[in-house]
Each structure stands twice: as structure tokens, then as C-alpha cells.
Amino acid sequence: KARIDAVATMLQFGKPTIDDLANAEIAYAPPFASAMDAVNAVANVADNILSGQLKPISSKEFGELWKDRANNNVFFADARPAVAGNATAAKYPGEWHAIALEDIEAKFDSIPKDRPVALVCNTGLRSYEVMLYLHNHGVTDVVNALGGMQALIKRGDNM
């Protein structure tokens, strides 16, 4: 209810910007909610997309890239913890690459700089962090699967 009240109040004074929503102060009780409300998180994602820090693709688009992997030259990187990423990489050697967020520095040189990179993790957050690292190191032809493996599984694309 607090988030609805906060956004409704903002709407009374005009159209709130993404920045307004990202910085909205929404009441919360620490045992029951996080300090950053869903409204703030959604606005931050929108801001990252508009600024180019996040280049999202839908789970459908990711699934299509994966199905056409023999023809599209995309490098598929899995940012989940090594146990999950390695299991999928073992099923698809040479096509699926386990590059866990915590291993990105050590495995950076294994990521091609001359091919598009498609990132995935469990929900999208870890792969977003990997995307930022890659961008900061000059690798910019990178997309991130929104919703990660959870969205792919819900669609029926179980890697």
C-alpha cells in the first residue's frame, strides 16, 4: 500500500520522471521489506536501459539466439555460480561458457572481443554485473537476458 500511495501522490503533482521514481522515499519496515522498494528498482532498471548501461533482450529473444547458435556467432556466457554454469556448459561444450560473476576477472581473456556476447544468470542481476564489467573493459556488443534462466524455464527453454 505504501508504494501505491507514494506513486499516487507523485502523480498529483504532474508526471514523475524516472529519476523521481528511482529516488522516491517509500516507507518500509526493515523486517518485512528492503530499503529499496520495487518502484525504485524498476526505475533504476529503466534508467540503465535508457542510458545504455543495460542492453536487455527478452527470454524469447535469448531462446531464439540459442536455437540459431550454429549460424549467429554469439558467445553465450552464464554468470550463475560455477556449479550451475558448469553443469550447463558440460551439456553444451564449446557453445555455453560458464563465467560466474565472481570469476569474471580471471576469465575475462576467454571472452571474445570480436563477437556478440549474450549473458544469462538465474534472474538477470549477476549477468547485469558482468555486463557492466565487460563495458568498463571495452566489450560493448553485449546483451543481457531479462529474467535470466528463471524466465527461460518458464517459457519452456530449459538449457
Task: State each model region's role.
Residues K1-L21:
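C-terminal catalytic lobe of FAD-dependent flavoproteins
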Residues P16-P30, S34, A41-G63, K67-V74, ...:
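Rhodanese-like catalytic fold shared by cysteine-dependent sulfurtransferases
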